[in-house]
Amino acid sequence: MTTRIVGTGSYVPEQIVTNDDLAKIVETNDEWIRSRTGIGARRIATAESNSRMAAEAARRALLQAEIAPEEVDLILMATSSPDYCFPNGACEVQEQIGAVNAAGFDISAACTGFVYALNTAHAYIKSGIYRTVLVIGSDVLSKLIDWTDRGTCVLFGDGAGAAVVRAADRGVIGVKMCSDGRGGSVLTCGSRT
């Protein structure tokens, strides 16, 4: 037995901030940003909370997978920008989508969070503890980044993606993960609280 993704969903806010918009507030331009990042625009949440975006992505993933929220055993939410210290975002999503039988917790691993959450789902399912896991990656980094820092404000936007992971005979062949914390100081984002 292994695991496979049986449904995916996403949500992005309506507001778009282009590179030209950023050029009005920091010393930069479209060519500078694109040549270094490949980014032309990013989405910014104005009214959406992190958990609301995550819940909408989750609903879309469940719909595609044709799985009812009550069938979800575990919700893993990868985020670096939770709405609150507690409750965790996964529990907020659980309530919003009606996944009344699911446990839930957050994973904080920055850009790699979704991959860590997928691996965690894989391990739980392979162990036989859970059969259906909802994995979500969601962030509202626009509320945390320094909009006067050209080196970071050009990189981040807001949005959510979700995947329904289930036990399967064919799917994931193997997983190998490692970390290298030596470059941790290269890109940082502090708390606003």
Tell me what each language-model feature is:
Residues 126-160:
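Flexible, glycine-rich active-site loops centered on histidine and acidic residues
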Residues 57-73:
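Phosphate/pyrophosphate-binding loops at sites that engage ATP/ADP/AMP, CoA/4′-phosphopantetheine
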Residues 4, 73-76, 134, 173:
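Conserved beta-strand elements of the Class I
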Residues 32-36, 40-52, 80-133:
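Conserved catalytic cysteine-centered active-site region
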Residues 11, 78-83, 109-114, 137-142, ...:
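Acidic, glycine-rich active-site loops and adjacent beta-strand->loop/helix elements
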Residues 1-47, 149-193:
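Condensing-enzyme catalytic core mediating Claisen C-C bond formation in acyl metabolism
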